[in-house]
Amino acid sequence: MSPKVLAVFVLCAILVVVMAGRTGTETGGNKKDTLQDLKKRTRNCFDRFEKGTCKMAKRNGACEWSDKYEMNCKKTCGLC
């Protein structure tokens, strides 16, 4: 291998490693939404799940420990 090809290969490898370490930073990479982000974006107060499902979740206390029911049964769980 010629030194130029080897140098290009090494520089590309360094670039890949650096960019892989920057995901989710100020560059707007692959940042996953947190529960707080979803709550901020969800302004309407309604239940996405069926009425019976939300009532069962409230009766079993799932509104307090389950993020799934907390986000999808807002009205029944009394979160808005």
UniProtKB/Swiss-Prot annotation:
Signal sequence coordinates: 1-20
Propiece span(s): 21-38
A Pfam family: ShK
Chain intervals for the UniProt region annotation (Crucial for binding to potassium channels): 68-69
Organism: Anemonia viridis
GO CC aspect terms: extracellular region; nematocyst
One annotated GO molecular function: potassium channel regulator activity
The name this protein goes by in its record: U-actitoxin-Avd9c
Family as reported in the entry's similarity comment: Belongs to the sea anemone type 1 potassium channel toxin family. Type 1b subfamily.
